[in-house]
């Protein structure tokens, strides 16, 4: 017998008459009797009903958005849209009409043929009026390539060089793997746009991006005059491009941008492809978009950044090789953008691609000074970025260093990659690096010099091939470079973010150089016969302690004046290393664990509140104000002269601290801006007597910088608050590790390995996806059989 159909809900009339209802609208009984048929809404619904309702609402939302975008972006079609709306045409029909006239899914191959063709050819420069017609048809193809490398195509993740995603802790990572944009060609025709093609990106569509008003000054070198073109198909809004360029060149890590601002901006305005290209401009704009803090609209910020970066990668993929200067610079800028997103593996691949392009690029010896400077900054900056990443991640194998790396990937040994040829090429590249340093500006040169000195020694020490004499030489090079740095720059209260970052990196280099020798120098090749005698009889443990303190102090100064909401790309790694070293000096790890668990990032966000105030105020105990620091005994005998401004002020201060930690009248003018102070000098201190320091320090000077304590527990608290206030993936993971200090503290040291750490952590180590572990804990990957060379 067939199963009888059940009606889940009868109409009101059939329910009242207690007759059978077929559930139709109107039902058969009401229709035959001519009665009004009505249903009472059910009090419960199945999941199928809810899914249908959700899908219906989503369709209505998409239709409404399509109509709104059309009204906003296409002034010439307003009358057509309004006439259809006034004609009571349904939103669904209007949305279908918009999609038909926009041809949303036109073939990407036809669209990509409009972009820059040959190598070195000048790009197609569109005026705002010319770009309007072509922009909406080109945007979706640019956005489609925002997924190359680390974004999504449909449901699959496409890594840069591997068929499967990689982990930062995998032991088979090889920097010799070439990054080939050519391999991404299969995705060029994937018709899966991330954004509607009709959407135009402009400053008006980003209302919450903190773009400064046009009346406010830009970075020197970027004038308020309208730009003649934008060099990008993503937007024709010249004002937006102007603001993003200003944002990029004013970034706190601009010394690592590898791009001379004056040469680039001149080429940008004149359409000169020698210093500028579409790929480089898109990379710069994407990096600038992603550097905005959380105060900006996260959706708009990411949409802009992904679109610009995706277009840069697409343009680089169309190049047969990257032998021109702008392409090499674009790869390096993309690497910095990936670092800021916490994507260390992608940044690693892009940085190596930049170095490989710099090596294979033909060098011209008869060039003007402007091009020599641009080439030197790009060449040395690319190598320095790799050196930094290797120091921060423990990938110090000598065979895979930039100077001795393989140029080609494959099972067969090519003549260029034979060991002897790699050694000869390594010496030649190192000599070229030293020659290019002569053309670099003073600030980048300082960073390049100390990084190369520390990286060279660390690479040989990694394979147990370094000697005590080489350690002394590397340490001496760092001190000499800092002395020249101090003589060149006035390290006063008006210091720039770049100067602060350079000093933080200098102290991290000292920490990375001497941390393996705090307990023992047994890893040195001649340690049994020779004990390293550092300049001024310096002690590695004292230097590491003072350097870690200096990193935290300088970061606090940076936070006070520039905010840590969006920090320089590598700052979280260095700060975490300093905090972890202070953990090893802390006698009570349980107390630290309690502090780390009570971290409240919002306490350190104020530009006026000092980190030390926030750290101790978080516990509601006003009696925990740190005491005055102890004078540096025999300071000049083991610490490089001169000191950084913060440490220098700490040495000079001995007067009791007043209740007010900052004197607003002496620090800020009526407009809220910092006033320069001539009472704070950068001269080297010659007196260490407390009475002399007290008499030479004024109240204004005493209140000008935060007063810090050198107690390890207090420094860990301050550093933890600083990390918690950073909007950075590595800082988030570092904060999570600091909450486990009670279990990690006894393991921190030069002999720590990943297996021991994995057993000690209270959470799976696989949850940590960046290189912050290697940075803070001083970890190094297991060395392979060393190449038999004697380094430059």
Curated annotation (Swiss-Prot):
InterPro entries: Transcr_Regulatory_Elem, Zn2-C6_fun-type_DNA-bd_sf, Zn2Cys6_DnaBD. It holds the Pfam family Zn_clus. Its main location: nucleus. Residues 11-37 bind DNA. Keywords: Conidiation, DNA-binding, Metal-binding, Nucleus, Sporulation, Transcription, Transcription regulation, Zinc. One of its GO terms (molecular function) is zinc ion binding. SMART domains: GAL4 (SM00066). One of its GO terms (cellular component) is nucleus. It comes from the Eukaryota. GO terms for biological process: conidium formation; sporulation resulting in formation of a cellular spore. Residues 662-704 are annotated as: Disordered. Residues 678-688 have a biased composition (Polar residues). It is found in: Nucleus. PANTHER family: CONIDIAL DEVELOPMENT PROTEIN FLUFFY, TY1 ENHANCER ACTIVATOR. Required for conidiophore morphogenesis where it has a role in the budding phase. This is Conidial development protein fluffy. It comes from Neurospora crassa (strain ATCC 24698 / 74-OR23-1A / CBS 708.71 / DSM 1257 / FGSC 987). The lineage of its organism: Eukaryota, Fungi, Dikarya, Ascomycota, Pezizomycotina. The gene is fl.
């Amino acid at each position: 017998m067939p199963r009888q159909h059940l009606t889940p809900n009868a109409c009101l009339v059939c329910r009242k008459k207690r007759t059978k209802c077929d559930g139709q609208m109107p039902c058969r009984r009401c229709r035959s009797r001519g009665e009004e048929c009505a249903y009472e809404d059910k009090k419960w619904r199945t999941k199928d009903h809810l899914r249908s309702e959700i899908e219906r609402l989503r369709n209505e939302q998409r239709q409404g958005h399509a109509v709104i975008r059309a009204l906003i972006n296409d002034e010439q079609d307003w009358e057509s849209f309004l006439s259809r709306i006034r004609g009571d045409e349904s939103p669904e029909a209007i949305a279908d009409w918009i999609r038909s006239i926009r041809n949303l899914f036109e073939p990407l191959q036809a669209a990509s043929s409009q972009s820059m063709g040959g190598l070195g050819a000048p790009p197609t420069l569109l005026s705002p009026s010319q770009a309007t017609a072509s922009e909406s048809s080109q945007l979706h193809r640019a956005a489609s390539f925002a997924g190359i490398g680390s974004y999504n195509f449909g449901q699959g993740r496409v890594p840069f060089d591997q068929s499967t995603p990689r982990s930062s802790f995998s032991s088979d990572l090889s920097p010799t793997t070439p990054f080939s944009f050519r391999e991404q060609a299969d995705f060029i025709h994937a018709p899966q746009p991330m954004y509607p093609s009709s959407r135009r990106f402009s400053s008006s569509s980003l209302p919450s991006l903190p773009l400064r008003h046009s009346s406010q000054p830009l970075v020197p070198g970027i004038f308020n005059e309208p730009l003649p073109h934008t060099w990008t198909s993503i937007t024709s809004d010249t004002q937006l491009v102007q603001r993003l360029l200003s944002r990029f060149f004013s970034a706190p890590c601009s010394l690592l941008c590898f791009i001379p601002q004056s040469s680039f901006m001149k080429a940008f305005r004149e359409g000169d492809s020698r210093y500028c290209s579409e790929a480089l401009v898109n990379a710069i704009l994407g990096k600038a978009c992603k550097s905005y803090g959380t105060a900006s609209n996260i959706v708009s910020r990411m949409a802009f950044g992904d679109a610009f970066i995706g277009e840069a990668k697409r343009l680089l993929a169309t190049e047969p090789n990257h032998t021109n200067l702008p392409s090499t610079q674009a790869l390096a800028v993309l690497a910095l953008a990936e670092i800021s997103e916490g994507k260390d593996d992608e940044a690693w691949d892009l940085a190596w691609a930049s170095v490989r392009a710099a090596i294979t690029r033909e060098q011209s010896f008869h060039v003007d000074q402007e091009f020599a400077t641009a080439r030197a900054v790009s060449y040395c900056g690319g190598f320095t970025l790799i050196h930094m990443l290797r120091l921060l991640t423990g990938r110090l194998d000598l065979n895979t260093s930039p100077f001795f790396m393989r140029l080609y990937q494959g099972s067969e040994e090519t003549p260029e990659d034979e060991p002897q040829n790699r050694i000869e090429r390594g010496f030649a590249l190192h000599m070229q690096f030293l020659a290019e340093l002569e053309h670099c500006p003073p600030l980048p040169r300082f960073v390049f010099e100390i990084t190369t000195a520390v990286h060279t020694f660390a690479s040989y020490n990694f394979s147990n091939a370094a000697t005590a004499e080489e350690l002394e030489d590397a340490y001496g090079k760092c001190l000499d470079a800092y002395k020249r740095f101090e003589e060149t720059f006035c390290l006063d209260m008006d210091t720039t973010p770049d100067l602060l970052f350079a000093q933080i990196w200098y102290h991290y280099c000292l920490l990375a150089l001497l941390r393996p020798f705090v307990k023992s120098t047994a890893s040195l090749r001649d340690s049994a016969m020779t004990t390293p005698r550092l300049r001024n009889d310096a002690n590695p443990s004292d230097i590491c302690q003072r350097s870690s303190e200096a990193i935290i102090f300088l970061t606090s100064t940076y936070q006070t004046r520039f905010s840590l909401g969006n920090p320089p790309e590598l700052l979280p790694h260095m700060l975490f290393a300093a905090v972890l070293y202070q953990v090893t000096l802390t006698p009570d790890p349980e107390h630290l664990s309690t502090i780390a668990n009570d971290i409240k990032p919002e306490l350190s966000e104020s530009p006026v509140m000092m980190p030390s105030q926030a750290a101790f105020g978080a516990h509601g105990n006003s009696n925990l104000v740190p005491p005055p620091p102890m004078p540096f005994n025999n300071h000049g005998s083991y610490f490089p002269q001169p000191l950084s401004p913060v440490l220098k002020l700490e040495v000079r201060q001995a007067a009791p601290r007043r209740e007010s930690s900052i004197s607003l009248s002496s620090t800020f003018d009526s407009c809220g801006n910092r006033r320069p102070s001539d009472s704070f000098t950068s001269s080297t201190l010659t007196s260490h007597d407390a009475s002399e320091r007290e008499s030479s320090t004024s109240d204004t000077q005493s209140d000008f910088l935060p007063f810090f304590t050198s107690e390890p527990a207090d420094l860990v608290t301050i550093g933890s608050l600083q990390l918690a206030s950073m909007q950075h993936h590595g800082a988030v993971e570092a904060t999570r590790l600091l909450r486990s200090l009670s279990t990690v503290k006894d393991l921190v040291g030069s002999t720590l390995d990943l297996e021991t750490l994995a057993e000690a952590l209270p959470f799976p180590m696989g949850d940590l996806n960046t290189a912050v572990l290697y940075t803070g804990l001083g970890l190094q990957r297991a060395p392979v059989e060393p190449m038999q060379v004697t380094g430059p």
